[in-house]
Design a protein with these regions (language model features):
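Extracellular ligand-binding/catalytic regions of CAZymes and related secreted enzymes
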Residues: 18-44, 64, 72-77, 235-236, ...
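Glycine- and acidic-residue-enriched helix-capping/strand-helix junction motifs
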Residues: 56-68
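Solvent-exposed loop/turn segments at secondary-structure junctions
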Residues: 55-58, 88-90, 107-111, 153, ...
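A short, well-structured beta->alpha microelement
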Residues: 78-93
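Short alpha-beta junction capping motif
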Residues: 49-50, 96-163, 259
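Short beta-strand segments enriched in small/hydrophobic residues
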Residues: 46-57
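Catalytic beta-strand/loop cores that center a nucleophilic Ser/Cys/Thr
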Residues: 28-37, 171, 175-258
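Bacterial Sec-dependent N-terminal signal peptides
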Residues: 1-18
Length: 304
């Protein structure tokens, strides 16, 4: 209760402004460990996760904090073994087989193709661009096949931009990134308070400072089961000409793809958000979902 009160008031103070970077030290790790769940919600066999944290585009300062938070969730609960990497060879088909699920941790791409694999491969100037692009497409295909055959995929915040111009990836995930207004306090609400994956939260959701993401491409198809959202009318500084004054934009969702499970969680740009134990529980439950440990309603809303 004490942490929840402190968290609430810190959010109010920081309203409509960016939060300062947090030092990733032992004190911060200890704080998160004390707040993290001590057991898994859905008892299951221990699973292996890859948390992939390479960025070629925007460098979210929260990347190392997010990776550490994921590792703490695995250790505290005993539900997961977590391997961290920035090596794109992890997306070779033989290497993906080592993991029950993959987490894309703010894996922002950049440049003309908005393709993380291409961005990294083109650094090797001894290989021509056509060969590099062929390899990039191969790694993307490996990821799609991995999920189709039963692997899990959890994409966090800026990870939505990993392959931002790829319609195949957009359909797999359920969206591509369009833009975000300034950081601000956001009231995140529950789409269905009875869904098993949102039981960590109170009925009215939670408030935190974050970038409110808006989406494009496959998002318009709404081929996913939404979990969290914000009201568009509450978001300040929207892009001129694209202002949304009605309806909602989803913040987290799930979808089945073949035998695999996919989840997107937008929170958060800021490590301060992880000081909310409810959000840590949501992350842990989401990891269990993509690992195949949770039976729940995945029915997509689909826009007709």
């Amino acid at each position: 209760i004490f942490y929840a009160i402190v968290f609430f008031f810190s959010i109010q103070i920081a309203f409509s402004q960016s939060l300062p970077e947090v030092t990733l030290d032992q004190a911060w790790k200890d704080k998160i460990r004390a707040l993290a769940p001590e057991k898994a919600t859905f008892p299951a066999k221990k699973k292996n996760f890859l948390v992939f944290s390479l960025h070629t585009g925007f460098n979210h300062w929260v990347i190392p904090h997010t990776e550490e938070m994921i590792k703490i969730l695995g250790e505290n609960s005993g539900a997961f073994t977590v391997t961290g990497s920035k090596d794109i060879t992890e997306f070779e088909a033989k290497n993906l087989k080592k993991y029950d699920a993959v987490i894309l941790n703010n894996t922002c791409s950049i440049g003309d193709h908005r393709n993380l694999f291409w961005d990294k491969l083109k650094e090797n100037t001894s290989v021509d661009s056509a060969t590099s692009m062929k390899k990039a497409l191969e790694l993307e295909a490996n990821l799609l096949s991995y999920v189709e055959k039963g692997g899990g995929l959890l994409v966090l915040h800026g990870g939505v931009t990993t392959l931002n111009n790829s319609w195949d990836f957009s359909r797999l995930l359920g969206a591509s990134f369009d833009y975000h207004p300034k950081q601000q306090a956001i009231q995140v609400r529950l789409e269905d308070a009875n869904h098993p994956l949102v039981q960590a939260f109170p009925a009215d959701g939670f408030n935190h400072v974050d970038e409110p993401y808006f989406y494009k491409n496959a998002y318009a198809e709404l081929d996913f089961k939404p979990l969290l959202y914000f009201n568009n009318s509450e978001i300040e500084s929207q892009r001129k000409g694209q202002e949304l004054t009605e309806g909602k934009t989803y913040v987290a969702w799930i979808r089945a793809e073949g035998r695999g499970k996919v989840m997107y969680i937008s929170p958060s740009h800021n490590a301060q958000s992880f000081e909310n134990p409810d959000l840590l529980q949501f992350y842990l439950d989401g990891m269990q979902y993509v690992a195949g440990d949770v039976e729940c309603d995945e029915t997509p809303i689909k826009k007709n």
